[in-house]
Amino acid sequence: WLDRVNGVTKEGGNIVSITMLSGKTYTGKMFIDATYEGDLMAAAGIDYHVGREGREVYGEEWNGVQTTVLHHRHHFGAVPKPISPYMIPGDPNSGVLPRISAEHPGNRHEGDKQVQAYCYRMCLTNDPKNRIPFSEPEGYDPGQYELLGRIYEAGWRETYDKFDPIPNHKTDTNNHGPMSTDNIGFNYAYPEASYKHRREILKEHQTYQKGWLWFHCTDPRVPKDIQEKFKTWGLPKDEFTDNDHWPHQIYVREAR
């Protein structure tokens, strides 16, 4: 792990050595930051940006906040019926449901510091001989998925649209839908966060996503046919064997 405060030594604008938190120092003629986070780049004083630049920065029409612009069916327009966002349906005074932000989304084309949501792209299998059934994660709270229950009650049925098949009865499973594996809004601090804070963010993402899996297996509001099919999936015994069969790397779609 790079010493992000004092770990970069430069001469004439060039990096000549880097020092890790362990105390080890590495010298070289060229250093390449090929990480998702760009910690070396930042520690070296290279200019960068986090979040969306406003349209006026570079004159790009698709920069900044894009309110009313909907993509990939990851939105509530894909749900057949309207859904109340409030704890007591129809009652704003009851407050919003968990995982819903009451903050203003911003004005179209304005910049902000928010980054695209992260998730763990999962390798799943429906091979009974190689499948580890999903289990209840520590800290599971079904109330965190109240919105998902209402989505199903409103008629949404696209659960398996991103269970993309790969060889050996496995999938590359990614986010799809208005409340899926992306942990929306809980990664905004990640690019600039300390190592400790990043670990906390990763843990929260794991808890959310494993809970999302368990909700599908157990909650009575999940349609019966979807739930029974969900129970045929699980983590492969022969993948990520040194990490409880869970992916090591979160899907950092963007950071610095």
Enumerate the predicted regions with their spans.
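Conserved beta-strand-loop-beta-strand element in the redox core of flavoprotein oxidoreductases
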Residues: 7-25
